Swiss-Prot record:
Compartments, record wording: Nucleus
SURP motif repeats: 211-253, 458-498
Pfam family, one: Surp
Name recorded for this polypeptide: Splicing factor, suppressor of white-apricot homolog
Example of a GO biological process term: mRNA 5'-splice site recognition
Modified residues (Phosphoserine): 283, 601, 621, 829, 831, 899, 903
Positions of the UniProt region annotated as Disordered: 1-28, 157-190, 269-298, 332-355, 403-438, 512-566, 589-680, 714-921
Amino acid composition bias (Basic residues), ranges on this chain: 753-787, 795-810, 835-861
Length: 945
């Protein structure tokens, strides 16, 4: 293919060259560009096997024995056979030098910054932060009037008549600079009041002293951690070398700092500025008047200010820590000098002596720990930096209410313009908290000064944006060095307020979801523990009643969750439990493992459940009794170690119980599948046999009796072991009658139940598709059994239903007894749909029995054509072998008397016969499942032994 193309290209090239050279006389005369292409013929051989091997990677070999990394023979990594020399585990510096926790944390942060570009799009992140910054600026501009540009009518305002800065002679500036240089470079002389030790070296110049003085003052106010921050930031600045311990001026800096903390030192820079202020007004009064006259403007020409209630409320209230030793020393010095105490920020006089201060510490702490929020409410100040939140708030008096979040504890605000209320007198006497001068108060707390109204919206907006977008947005805003956002610097006076608002918005953003999640997690465990402990003391019904009274959510969790600490607790349902809609996943293990004997009436069933619950409380198994006793005894006095040990034990028991449940479920599933296959084969054979040669009714009865006999032999007494607890035995005989106390429910409930039965029966008779309506309360797992009958088979059964129904009465009491010996949970199957139905109404098995009895009585009436009086006389004898209570018989009799006049009686008899045949097959299904579960439990018991 290449050969032909190459020849064509050569021909074109030659022709093109000739054409170009022909008309123009030169090679460059035409527009065509010369192209030289060579082509060679090539044969391709198709090798499918090698291509397939290449695709499957058969030519690749594992690199250094690692099958995850496959290389071919041309890969350069094949030359690397030993990486131990380059392994980071052996060759890094960290092997010799162990990092502390803080250093490891910093190193991890550095690694995150190093490799940030691997998993983050930095350009997109920067664009997003820029967008957020623009939004913040727009939001601030919307709130304020042209607040993007600070417009002032001062001396800096441009005036055309005045000379500009370039034209202005710079003599005055030179003079001021020279004066400053002279002041800064003059040698430092220690003031008279400061007695510096002889071994401490003084700074050479006044400028150096001023830097040391201001640094010491800042560290005294802000706390010792700011000294570390300053040292890190100013590491390259030679003027701050005195912060290093080996510097010759460090002892002088420490001496000044100590003197400031003890109150023996006054700042020289402040005193100088005060002197200038005092001397200034006397000399410059006339000049100021002239300036005022020159720059006077009518108030209407000024920019409009926001007039809001905030201006009245927002008064700068400085928070002073009364427990600080410096404040105590100042008060003591003032009391010793017997000078009148200066009023504080709000005009309240300071405490005159140390004794009064200690006695009144709760009042002072209550007063000074408040500060006003923008909405007029008062709020507790957040703890100073470097102090643990728990220890800080535990030292506060008991009158101060403290919430879990630092600095967001709002109290009832006093009316605006008044001071916060003092604490009640009872709080001081009831709490054992005295005045605390703890070690944590050695660090001076940050004075949270609410900003003025023009700055406060900016701080609030930025704090809200940072809480929403994260701390990276704050660092990006801080890096822009915008004058409006100077409060982001830690040395700024409004930084503490900004930090407080940021924490407030952070908690507002993330507090609700975590709180809801924590309450949702705590609720079921609390109710379950309470239920188990109460069941150990007073029996299960009382525990159910107590937990039920605590709220609908807790009642639901308490009734449905009976697995506490990994042990399967026997669920003793009180009559109220039938009105509770239980969760599907919670009831599944209960339905599998609860073994109760059932009778035909609901009252007997409830009384038997009561009897079983009392017997299980009276004779508990040894595996489950000790934990409940431990909970009873050690509930009031559980230490931290005991709690941890108990939690570890509970986790271990949880794992063991979960493993046992999984094994049981797996075994039951496997055996269930095998049993189901065998049952399907047997049913298919029976069905084909009935289609080929229909059996007479007596033979069908014998067949069904034989199947039930086989199932009865399979039901052996076998205890189920789940979670270290034995459940009651299965027995083939019907149970004894329980006590009359539990047997007799109120008569009103009986009447309501009768009414419900009559309504349901009349509803099922009035519908035309009887087959579907009668089998509705069954679970979804039996839908195949319901619909497996073809239409031809249904018609055959319908034609024979009249003659069969009287004869089948012969073996029906036996089947009823056999059904009675099967537990309710197994008869219903373990599906959640069935369990839900059971909680609302009677079990499907009882409905099944009632429908059978109804169809039999109707068929009897049709075949024998007896009078109503005879039929009424024969009815008690027909039901005497089956029912123990009188109310079901009466209800059946009354329902039959009402339904005699119904026009659709014939259709009802036919459909009831079909339903009874389908029900017999479903009952066989259920018995097969029971056998499978029992076989699985036997296998589990033998493997455990």
């Amino acid at each position: 293919m290449y050969g032909a193309g190459g020849g064509r290209a050569k021909a074109e090239r030659k022709g093109g060259v000739k054409e170009e050279a022909g008309p123009g006389g030169t090679g460059t005369g035409g527009n065509r560009v010369e192209l030289l292409v060579f082509g060679y013929a090539c044969k391709l051989f198709r090798d499918d096997e090698r291509a397939l091997a290449q695709e499957q990677g058969q030519h690749l070999i594992p690199w250094m024995g690692d099958h995850k990394i496959l290389i071919d023979r041309y890969d350069g990594r094949g030359h690397l056979h030993d990486l131990s020399a380059y392994d980071a585990e052996y060759a890094t510096w960290n092997r010799d030098y162990q990092l502390s926790e803080e250093e490891a944390r910093v190193e991890a942060l550095c690694d995150e910054e190093r490799y940030l570009a691997l998993h983050t799009d930095l350009l997109e992140e920067e664009a997003r932060q820029e967008e957020e910054y623009k939004r913040l600026s727009e939001a601030l501009a919307e709130d304020g009037n042209y607040s993007a540009v600070g417009f002032t009518y001062g001396s800096d305002y441009y005036d055309p008549s005045e000379p500009t800065e370039e034209e202005e002679p710079s003599k005055q500036r030179e003079k001021s600079e020279a004066e400053n240089l002279e002041e800064n470079e003059e040698p430092f002389i220690a003031p008279l009041g400061l007695s510096v030790p002889s071994d401490v070296e003084l700074p050479p110049t006044a400028k150096m002293h001023a830097i040391i003085e201001r640094t010491a003052n800042f560290v005294c106010k802000q706390g010792a951690q700011f000294e570390i921050m300053l040292k890190a930031k100013q590491a390259r600045n030679s003027q701050f070398d005195f912060l290093r311990f080996d510097h010759y001026l460090n002892p002088y800096y420490k001496f000044i700092q100590k003197a400031m903390k003890e109150g023996r030192y006054t700042v020289l820079a402040e005193s100088k500025s005060e002197e200038k202020k005092k001397s200034g007004p006397t000399s410059d009064n006339e000049e100021e008047d002239d300036e005022e006259d020159g720059s006077y403007l009518h108030p209407s020409l000024f920019a409009s200010k926001k007039s809001s209630r905030l201006e009245e409320l927002m008064k700068p209230l400085k928070v002073v820590d009364p427990d600080h030793p410096l404040a105590a020393l100042v008060r003591k010095a003032q009391a010793d000098s017997s000078a009148p105490a200066p009023p504080t920020a709000d005009g309240t006089p300071a405490q005159p002596s140390q004794v009064e201060y200690t006695a009144d510490s709760t009042v002072a702490a209550m007063y000074y720990s408040y500060y006003m929020l923008p909405d007029g409410t008062y709020c507790l100040a957040p703890p100073p930096p470097g102090i643990d939140v728990a220890t800080y708030y535990s030292t506060l008096p008991a009158g101060v209410t403290v919430s879990s979040s630092p600095g967001v504890t709002t109290t009832v605000p006093p009316p605006p313009g008044t001071t916060p209320p003092p604490p009640p007198t009872t709080a001081e006497s009831s709490s054992g908290v005295t005045s605390t001068t703890t070690t944590t108060s050695a660090l001076a707390p940050v004075a949270i000064i609410p900003p003025p109204p023009d700055i406060q919206p900016v701080i609030d907006k930025l704090a809200e944006y940072v809480a929403r977008n994260g701390l990276k947005f704050e660092t990006s805003v801080r890096a822009k060095n915008d004058q409006r956002f100077e409060f982001l610097q830690p040395w700024h006076q409004y930084n503490a307020y900004y930090e407080f608002k940021k924490q407030f918005f952070l908690q507002k953003e993330g507090g609700g979801s975590t709180q809801a999640a924590s309450t949702a997690e705590e609720a079921p465990t609390e109710t379950a523990v309470e239920e188990s402990s109460e069941a150990g003391e007073d029996g299960a019904p009382e525990g159910m009643a107590e937990t039920g009274g605590r709220g609908s959510g807790k009642k639901e969790a308490g009734s449905s969750k009976s697995t506490v600490d990994g042990k399967l607790v026997k669920a003793s349902f009180a009559p109220i439990s039938f009105a509770i809609k239980a969760k599907e996943n919670d009831l599944l293990p209960l339905e599998k493992n609860r073994v109760k004997l059932d009778d035909d009436s609901e009252e007997d069933e409830e009384s038997r459940e009561c009897q079983e619950s009392t017997s299980s409380v009276a004779n508990p198994s040894p595996a489950a009794a000790p934990p409940s006793a431990v909970v009873e005894e050690k509930k009031p006095q559980l230490t931290q170690e005991e709690l941890e040990a108990k939690q570890a034990k509970q986790k271990l028991e949880d794992r063991l119980a979960a493993a046992a449940r999984e094994k049981l479920a797996q075994a039951s599933k496997e055996s269930k599948e095998k049993q189901l296959q065998a049952e399907r084969k047997r049913k298919a054979a029976l069905f084909l046999q009935t289609l080929k040669n229909p059996l007479p009714d007596a033979e069908v009865g014998k067949l069904e009796e034989s199947t039930f006999g086989v199932e009865e032999t399979g039901v052996m007494p076998c205890p189920l072991l789940v979670g270290g607890r034995t459940l009651p035995m299965l027995e083939g005989k019907p149970p004894e009658r329980p006590s009359s106390r539990c047997r007799d429910p109120p008569r009103e409930e009986e009447r309501e139940k009768k009414k419900k039965k009559h309504k349901k029966r009349s509803r099922t008779r009035s519908r035309s598709p009887k087959y579907h309506s009668s089998s509705k309360p069954r679970s979804r797992s039996h839908s195949k059994a319901k619909h497996s009958l073809p239409s031809a088979y249904r018609t055959v059964r319908r034609s024979r239903s009249r003659s069969r129904s009287p004869r089948r009465r012969a073996h029906s009491p036996e089947r009823r007894r056999e059904d009675r010996s099967v537990p309710t949970a197994y008869r219903m199957s373990g599906s959640p749909g069935v369990s839900r139905k059971r909680t609302r109404s009677r079990s499907p098995h009882e409905k099944k029995k009632k429908r059978r009895s109804r169809s039999r009585t109707k068929a009897k009436a049709r075949s024998q054509s007896t009078s109503p009086s005879k039929q009424a006389a024969q009815r008690p004898s027909a039901h005497s072998a089956h029912s123990a209570s009188i109310s079901p018989v009466e209800s059946r009799g009354s329902s039959q008397e009402r339904s005699r006049g119904v026009s659709q009686e014939k259709d009802g008899q036919i459909s009831s016969a079909i339903v009874s045949s389908v029900q017999s097959k479903i009952t066989q299904d259920l018995m097969a499942k029971v056998r499978a579960m029992l076989a699985a439990s036997k296998n589990l018991q033998t493997s455990a032994s």
